[in-house]
Structure formats: C-alpha cells, structure tokens
From Swiss-Prot:
Extracellular face residues: 29-53, 108-131
Listed transmembrane segments: 8-28, 54-74, 87-107, 132-152
Main location: membrane
Keyword Phosphoprotein: no
GO CC annotations, alphabetized: plasma membrane
Family: Belongs to the Casparian strip membrane proteins (CASP) family.
Classification via Pfam families: CASP_dom (PF04535)
Ranges facing Cytoplasmic side: 1-7, 75-86, 153-161
Membrane topology qualifier: Multi-pass membrane protein
Protein name: CASP-like protein 1C2
PANTHER family listed in its UniProt record: CASP-LIKE PROTEIN 1U1
Subunit structure, as described in the record: Homodimer and heterodimers.
C-alpha cells in the first residue's frame, strides 16, 4: 500500500510540475504587445529579451522532462540518475526564473541610473502576461523542489529502513 501511495504522490507532483512549467512557457511565449507612444511604435515581445527566451526554453525542457518521467517505472536502477537529473532541472529552472525576474523588474520599475524607463505603463497586457508566466514558473520551481525532496526521501530514506 505504501508503494502505491508513493507512486500516486509522485505522479501528482510530476503532473503539477508539468502543468506549471508548460503554462509558464506557453504564457511567456505568447506575450506580445504593440503600441504607439509619442509617435514611436513600441513592440514588446518575449523574444526581444534573452532572459525571457532562456525562461521559455528552461520551462519547456522542465515540462518535457516531467512528462517523460511520468512513464518511468517506479522501480528500477535509473532512480539515482533521476534524482541527479531532478537536481539539474531544479537549478536550471531556478536560474531561468532569476534571470527573468531581474529583467521583469527593470521593465516594471526602470533604472534611473542607467536612464532606462519603465515600460509597463505603455504595454500593460505584455507585463501582465510576463507576470503570469513568472508566477507559473515560480510555482514550477517550488514543485520541483518539493519533488526533489520527496524523491530523495522515498528512494533513499525509505528504502534503507
């Protein structure tokens, strides 16, 4: 019974992580807005920022990884590799959200020392999309951290007792 409970919990966490990272990638990849400000055409798009591209790629990889692991048998010799891969994916997602958050902050607040003006007043829909993507990405990172802890606990601690 404990094995079934562990497997169900693992599947639920993986599905949630898959959903969060896939949502983050899709919402960020579809963020786009064009407006005119003082007779200048402004286009805001995720692909104009390397940090946002990195965020989309990292979340797409994280969601594909979670989807693949849903089909991995719960017993086998691959689990030490899965735990190591979970660490890599968790850190990958953490670095991508950190990079994206720093750019989003500059977009929202600007940087008076560098002379960069905030853009969210001119392209609010774009900023709302980015905020939603970052929220989903943060949820994905938290889920991956929980998943990593759960995997370590079930595969290392429970198997030794």
């Amino acid at each position: 019974m404990a094995k079934n409970t562990d497997r169900i919990c693992f599947l639920v966490l993986r599905l949630l992580a898959f959903g969060a990272t896939l949502s983050a990638a899709i919402v960020m990849a579809t963020s786009h807005e064009r407006t005119t400000y003082l007779s200048l055409s402004i286009e805001a798009k995720y692909s104009h920022t390397p940090a946002f591209k990195y965020f989309v790629i990292a979340n797409a990889i994280g969601s594909a990884y979670s989807l693949l692991l849903l089909f991995l048998p719960s017993h086998g010799s691959l689990w030490p590799l899965v735990i190591a891969s979970d660490v890599v994916i968790t850190m990958f997602l953490t670095s991508s959200i950190s990079a994206a958050l720093s750019i989003a902050y500059v977009g929202k607040k600007g940087n008076s020392y560098a002379g960069w003006l905030p853009i969210c007043d001119q392209v609010p829909n774009y900023c709302n999309h980015v905020t939603g993507a970052l929220a989903a990405g943060f949820i994905g990172v938290v889920l991956y951290m929980v998943l990593l802890q759960y995997s370590i606990y079930t595969k290392c601690c429970k198997s030794s007792s």
